[in-house]
């Protein structure tokens, strides 16, 4: 919500909210409009790839042109498989910007807007964001050991509204 809705509105951009995802509705909207930014989760990109690969002729040419003309395309909220990233680039000419965030923090990690975007990664911590991996016992993991992502920074929200117990269980210094 923060990245897809609040940020564009804050700078005076307009936002199209298409409702529940239907691949036909998204393709139709993209073809009828001149969007400059598009953000979606990996499952939507997967469905769009499937749809585009079944298109032919002028319809295919139009949708590819419309996606290619966009200034920025982002993927977030889940891991984007490298093969989806590659296929999207082949079909549209767009190099997806993978990012990581959540409702509680907005965006915390990102590949660079300009420069090398590493497929299959969410990039590095944004300015003023500290990130570490922790084990269940709240101990920072050793290098190359899996763990839960922990984020600290000024963008982390303060609390769950009227949910003191949930807040205490979820946040610590």
Enumerate the predicted regions with their spans.
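Conserved short alpha-helical elements in the N-terminal third of ANL/AMP-binding
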Residues: 1-15, 31, 36
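Gly/Ser/Thr-rich phosphate-binding loop
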Residues: 10-13, 35-40, 49-118, 130, ...
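ATP-dependent adenylate-forming carboxylate-activation enzymes
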Residues: 13-33, 51
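Alpha-helix capping/helix-boundary segments
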Residues: 44-45, 80, 156
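Conserved ANL (AMP-binding/adenylate-forming) active-site segment centered on the GW(Y/F)…HTG consensus within
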Residues: 93, 154-173
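Short Gly/Pro-enriched turn/cap motifs at secondary-structure boundaries
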Residues: 116, 120-126, 170-173
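Conserved beta-loop-beta connector loops within the AMP-binding
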Residues: 132-151, 170
